Amino acid sequence: MSIGLTFTGRIEGPAALAEAAKILAEQRGCSLSVNRTGLRLELCPLGGQLNMLWRPGEAPEDPWLVRGECVSTPAGAGLHRAAVELLDGLPIRRLAVEDETGFFRHRNFQRMKEEHFYTWLRTLVEVCARESGKGVSGMQLCWDLGQYAPEDIPDTVVTPMGRFRLSELADMVERDGIEALAGRFFLWNGRTQDARFYRNRAINALWEHCCFAPSSRSQEDEAVNAAILDDLERAAKLDPSLPLPRASYEEVCALAGREPVLADGPALEEEFSPGYRKGPVTHALGALRLTLPGGYLYRWEQWDSGGAHLWTDGGSDSPIWRVNAYHAREGEAQFTDSLNALHGVEGRELRGGALRWGWREIQEDGEPLYQAVCEVIAGPALYLLTATCTGPEGLGQIAQTIGGISVVTNTARRETVQTQKE
């Protein structure tokens, strides 16, 4: 269930369209990426993209054909308006737009919000209200299933804009009206990128991306921390009366080594303080579910032949995790004999699979290290995990993490995806 638009049209060629998009991107302050088959304009987080693909006409003399789309939820009505206005400025002939909100035709922003985006939001509120008080765990709204899953807290819902009690959304609508909730739930609910837009963009980054680690740890931490502070400071200048997450602002200032500059003003008061990555988060690789501290950074480690998924927090004393996935050519995956030479080998059954693990001492750059090796089988899939630490005391933490490993069957994954769509 989403709101968006699709379009088709004709263009002189990719170069002319890309050049026009570049000019618009510079004017509107959005980013542009172009490849040989199309382009993407990034207007805001939460899927705030205008995507388009092109192909030549049937005959050499025919114009090129272009098609594209923008999905406007959960980002908000401001994104929808911005996407329509970008289409207005692009050299696309015979432009045909399928806009379920009707905004491309009538251009009444308030009408679009009330008839479509607020109706969409009320539906989500009703879903949460029905589940309230049942002790529901793992409920997510508008969450990207391709990334980590935050820690479960019963009777709450995870969203890109923060964690809420299931009853809280309905209470807010009853107390303050749908407009108030929309201004907090949608990242871009206004006509323009106003103070609330910058505040909400910072709130999204605090909840979803910030590791609450020093900026000196990595370029990723430096960029995220700086963006949060810049957005909150800009929001305060545009509207000094707007409530802001001031405690989080001061916390990130300390991490970034920046002096707080916000003048006194109202604080955004909420039950849950920002930061999914302050707690444990669960990563999905196929059927495997691996729960690690949220502060760990992920990257793909390239090897001469292949590579591995790698998680580390940059600290010398914390385990470094690597994961590889393999698939049996026929039948079910089986454990290998590689673990037989390890110390303390043990195993356990999982719902939908099984695992075995042990540990060994290794040398790396002349330094003694301890490494746990774990194999997980789930149907035809075999997952090989290693966790390397500097001392034997780190094996206890690794054992706890391995104790939390689970696998998800295809049936369960289908049910999860269906729940997210509903």
Feature locations, PLM:
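Mixed-charge, glycine-accented linear interaction segment located at domain edges/termini
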Residues: 388-419
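Short secondary-structure junctions
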Residues: 22-35, 97, 294-302, 340-355
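Short, conserved charged micro-motifs
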Residues: 11-19, 330-337, 395-396
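Secretory pathway targeting signatures of secreted, lumenal, and periplasmic proteins
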Residues: 284-337
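Signature of long, low-cysteine stretches enriched in small and polar/charged residues
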Residues: 284, 335-391, 415-422
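Short, flexible beta-strand-to-coil junctions
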Residues: 12, 37, 314-316, 326-330, ...
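Acidic (Asp/Glu-rich) sequence patches and key acidic residues
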Residues: 1-278, 283, 304-311, 315-322
